[in-house]
Amino acid sequence: MSKLFWATLSFISRLPVPSRWAQGLDFEQYSRGIVMFPLIGAILGGLSGLIFILLQPWCGIPLAALFCILALALLTGGFHLDGLADTCDGIFSARRRERMLEIMRDSRLGTHGGLALIFVLLAKILVVSELALRGTPVLAALAAACAAGRGSAALLMYRHRYAREEGLGNVFIGKVSGRQTCVTLGLAAIITTVLLPGMQGLAAIVITLAAIFILGQLLKRTLGGQTGDTLGAAIELGELIFLLALL
């Protein structure tokens, strides 16, 4: 189990993990790491929140929010943001399904992808700033949001098909069992309600899961399945929806 945790951590983040800690684990086994997504999300969000706490007394709330969201992007290497941009480039191209998937595979950033990145990043900065002004503990909010965002991605894996013939997303999409999905969603709910006691955390995770489930169905109808890019988009949008639900 520890090897699976370290392998999953190195797969979905840029935190340095010694290769020997995940040695001996086949790539095909990574799908079992879905249950680690909420915990890893909480760690990444907590580190981002720590940046906010350290910088806020020195530079104020808006700049601290800017740098903590930047830190979160760096901690993941922009992995999920890239998926968000590619997904928006493909979906909003309004082309045939096959052409949409080709556009999503293109490494160049399009207009729709650029607008999506600007909107999501700016929205996160503004929402974190507003939460801080309202007295919400930012570290707990970010840790919970990242746990919820990554946990909700399981909804785009279970009983979904991979829209392409090959790619990184194929490791998870359609390979996750119902039990693993329930454990993942349950762990995300536990983490969020522990970090944000009362109805606030519970309501936010319910809203997030409902929104991402609907997103998954819309993407399935449009693309014929899911890809690694749509998983990244779901994670980024899940984080933002959770934070918005806390307002």
From Swiss-Prot:
Main location: membrane
Pathway listed: Cofactor biosynthesis; adenosylcobalamin biosynthesis; adenosylcobalamin from cob(II)yrinate a,c-diamide: step 7/7
Assigned GO CC terms: plasma membrane
Cell compartment(s), UniProt: Cell inner membrane
UniProt keyword terms in alphabetical order: Cell inner membrane, Cell membrane, Cobalamin biosynthesis, Magnesium, Membrane, Transferase, Transmembrane, Transmembrane helix
Membrane topology per record: Multi-pass membrane protein
An example Gene Ontology molecular-function term: adenosylcobinamide-GDP ribazoletransferase activity
Family statement drawn from the similarity comment of this UniProt entry: Belongs to the CobS family.
Organism from which the protein derives: Salmonella arizonae (strain ATCC BAA-731 / CDC346-86 / RSK2980)
Chain's role: Joins adenosylcobinamide-GDP and alpha-ribazole to generate adenosylcobalamin (Ado-cobalamin). Also synthesizes adenosylcobalamin 5'-phosphate from adenosylcobinamide-GDP and alpha-ribazole 5'-phosphate.
EC number: 2.7.8.26
PANTHER family listed in its UniProt record: ADENOSYLCOBINAMIDE-GDP RIBAZOLETRANSFERASE (PTHR34148:SF1)
Pfam families registered for this protein in UniProt: CobS (PF02654)
Transmembrane intervals: 34-54, 59-79, 113-133, 138-158, 194-214
GO biological process: cobalamin biosynthetic process
Name of the protein in its database record: Adenosylcobinamide-GDP ribazoletransferase
InterPro entries assigned: CobS
Catalytic activity: alpha-ribazole + adenosylcob(III)inamide-GDP = adenosylcob(III)alamin + GMP + H(+); alpha-ribazole 5'-phosphate + adenosylcob(III)inamide-GDP = adenosylcob(III)alamin 5'-phosphate + GMP + H(+)
Class of this enzyme: transferase
Keyword Membrane assigned: yes
Cofactor(s), names only, from the UniProt record: Mg(2+)
Gene name in the database record: cobS
